[in-house]
UniProtKB/Swiss-Prot annotation:
Keywords attached to this entry: Cell inner membrane, Cell membrane, Membrane, Transmembrane, Transmembrane helix
Protein name listed in UniProt: UPF0761 membrane protein Sbal223_0320
Organism: Shewanella baltica (strain OS223)
Taxonomic path: Bacteria, Pseudomonadati, Pseudomonadota, Gammaproteobacteria, Alteromonadales
Annotated GO CC locations: plasma membrane
Coiled coil: none
Length: 323
C-alpha cells in the first residue's frame, strides 16, 4: 500500500508539472511573446550602438576600469553574440567612435534611444506580469537612468572581482588547480543567472518571490547557453546566410540571434509570472478537495479523529483509479 501511495504521489507530481506546462502554454499564446520578442529585437538593434557608447563612456569615467575595457568587450561579444562576435565588435567600435565625435544634441539623442530600449523592456515585462499600477514618469525615468549609468559599472565591477578571485594564490594549490578552468567555464552561466534573476525581480512593478524568479532565471540561462551553442553550430556548419547575403550576412545573423535571445528572456519571465498563478490555483483546488473529502473519510473510518490530508486524498484517488 505504501509503495502504491509513493507511486501515486510521483504520478501526481508529474501530473502537476504537466498542468503547469499547459498553463504556461496558454499564457505564451495569450501574451504573444513571439511578437513582443520581435519588437524588442528591433528596438535592440536601434539601441545597440547608443547602449555600447553610453556603457563605454561610463566605464571610461572610472580609472579602475581603464585597463579592462578590452576584456569586457571580448567577454560580452564572445558570450552574447555567437559566431559573429568578432565582426560585430569591429563594426560597433567603429560606430561608437563616430558617435563619440558628435555634438551634444547628437549624444543626447543617443541617450534617448538607449532609454527607449530600457523602457520597452520595462513595458514588456510588466505586461507579462499583468501589472495594473504603472510607475510615475519621474520614478520610471530615474530607474531607467540608474540602469543606464550603474549597469555598466556593476558589470565592470563584477568582472574585476572575478579577475581578482581567479588571481588569488589559493587557486595555485594542487588540490584546487583543477577548479580554475571549471570556474572560468561556468562564469558566463553564473552571470546569465544573476542577470536574469535581477531582471525578473527588479523590473516588474510588483513583488516577485525569489524562488520563482530563480527558477525562471535558471531555465532562461540554460536555454540561453544551449541556444548560443546551437546557433553558433548552425551558422558555422550551415552557412546559408553567408551564401545568400554575402558580406551583409552579419546583419540577419545578429537580428536572428537577438530575436531568439529575447524569446528566451520572455519565456523565463513567463515561467516566473506563471508560478504564483498556478500555485494559487492548485492551493484553492486542494482546499476544495479536502473539504469534500473530509465527510467521506469520517464516514468510512467511523472516527472523527481520522482526517486525511488533501495530498493523501489525491494519492488514494489515483491509486483507486489505477486499480
Amino acid at each position: 500500500m505504501t509503495k502504491k501511495i509513493e507511486l501515486a504521489q510521483i504520478r501526481v507530481l508529474f501530473l502537476g508539472i504537466w498542468h503547469f506546462l499547459l498553463h504556461l502554454r496558454r499564457r505564451l499564446v495569450e501574451d504573444q511573446i513571439n511578437i513582443r520578442a520581435g519588437h524588442l529585437a528591433y528596438v535592440t538593434l536601434l539601441s545597440l550602438v547608443p547602449m555600447v557608447a553610453v556603457t563605454m563612456s561610463m566605464l571610461s569615467a572610472f580609472p579602475v576600469f581603464k585597463g579592462i575595457r578590452g576584456q569586457i568587450e571580448g567577454f560580452v561579444y564572445e558570450n552574447f553574440l555567437p559566431a559573429a562576435g568578432d565582426t560585430v565588435q569591429v563594426y560597433i567600435n567603429e560606430f561608437v567612435g563616430n558617435a563619440s565625435k558628435g555634438t551634444a544634441v547628437g549624444i543626447s539623442a543617443l541617450v534617448v534611444v538607449a532609454i527607449m530600449l530600457i523602457s520597452a523592456i520595462d513595458k514588456s515585462l510588466n505586461n507579462i506580469w499583468r501589472t495594473k499600477e504603472k510607475r510615475s514618469v519621474v520614478v520610471a525615468f530615474s530607474m531607467y537612468w540608474m540602469v543606464l549609468t550603474l549597469g555598466p559599472v556593476l558589470v565592470g565591477a563584477s568582472l574585476v572581482a572575478s579577475s581578482y578571485v581567479i588571481s588569488l594564490k589559493v587557486f595555485e594549490a594542487e588540490a584546487l588547480s583543477g577548479m580554475l578552468p571549471i570556474f572560468i567555464a561556468r562564469l558566463p552561466m553564473l552571470f546569465s543567472v544573476a542577470a536574469f534573476l535581477l531582471l525578473y525581480m527588479v523590473v516588474p512593478n510588483q513583488k516577485v518571490k525569489f524562488l520563482h524568479a530563480l527558477l525562471g532565471a535558471i531555465v532562461a540561462a540554460l536555454l540561453f547557453e544551449l541556444g548560443k551553442k546551437g546557433f553558433a553550430l548552425y551558422v558555422t556548419q550551415f552557412p546559408s546566410y553567408e551564401a545568400i547575403y554575402g558580406a551583409l550576412a552579419t546583419i540577419p545573423i545578429v537580428f536572428v540571434w537577438v530575436y531568439l535571445s529575447w524569446m528566451i528572456v520572455l519565456l523565463g519571465a513567463e515561467i516566473t509570472a506563471a508560478m504564483p498563478e498556478y500555485l494559487d490555483y492548485e492551493s484553492s483546488s486542494d482546499d476544495e478537495t479536502a473539504l469534500n473529502a473530509k465527510p467521506l473519510a469520517d464516514a468510512s473510518q467511523g472516527d472523527s479523529s481520522s482526517v486525511l490530508t488533501s495530498a493523501e486524498v489525491t494519492a488514494l484517488k489515483a491509486v483507486a483509479k489505477s486499480e
